Structures are given as structure tokens and as C-alpha cells.
């Protein structure tokens, strides 16, 4: 199976995660969460054992509504919900402005799922 390269936004989340979260919760990049139904959608970062995904939306796509409002992205969100994944959406600006808060939100969800 071919793995997709990490994008800069995923790297940004992973950098803050490594600095602020316990090492026991290691994120996975570009995980194909819907492979079980024959699809190929991936989260930027996720924690598969807890069914928690992280999408870092933004950059050049955010202007004029952005790519993240497309039908394909809505389908991805709906598939994730139907498979009972909890998905967090952050922008790079949110991560830079409040990395502690973003990491704490995801960490709380992980701990609540244990």
C-alpha cells in the first residue's frame, strides 16, 4: 500500500502534539479510516484505536469558502460520522494561537474514550 506524504498542516499539529501531549498517545498521519467500506479517505492525523481524527483545514484553500466546503469533503465528514469517528477541525492559525487548547481538546476526547 502506498502511503501519502505528510502535509505541512499535519506536521504543524504533530509538532505541537509532541511538545504538549503524553508520549503514550502517538498520532498516525494519513490514515485511511474508511478502508473497511472500500473507500480511500484519510485524516491529516488520527488516533485509530480511539476513532479520533484531526483535520487541519486552511491555507490557500480557505479563501472564498475554500476547498473544505466541497461535496467531497462533506461526503468524507459524513462517512466518518457514519463509522462513529470523532473528527476535530483546526486551522493553522488556531494551532498557532492556542496550541495548548487544541491539544487539550483532542487529549480530553482520547481520555474520555478509554
Residue map of PLM features:
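Nucleic-acid endo/exonuclease domains
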Residues: 1-114
Amino acid at each position: 500500500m502506498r502511503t501519502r506524504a505528510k502535509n505541512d498542516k499535519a506536521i504543524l499539529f504533530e509538532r505541537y502534539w509532541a511538545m504538549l501531549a503524553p508520549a503514550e498517545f502517538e498520532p498516525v498521519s494519513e490514515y485511511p479510516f474508511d478502508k473497511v467500506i472500500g473507500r480511500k479517505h484519510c485524516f491529516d492525523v488520527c488516533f485509530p484505536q480511539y476513532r479520533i481524527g484531526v483535520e487541519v483545514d486552511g491555507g490557500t484553500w480557505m479563501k472564498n469558502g475554500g476547498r473544505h466546503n466541497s461535496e467531497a469533503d462533506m461526503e468524507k465528514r459524513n462517512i466518518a460520522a457514519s463509522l462513529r469517528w470523532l473528527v476535530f477541525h483546526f486551522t493553522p492559525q488556531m494551532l498557532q494561537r492556542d496550541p495548548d487548547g487544541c491539544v487539550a481538546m483532542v487529549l480530553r476526547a482520547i481520555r474520555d474514550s478509554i
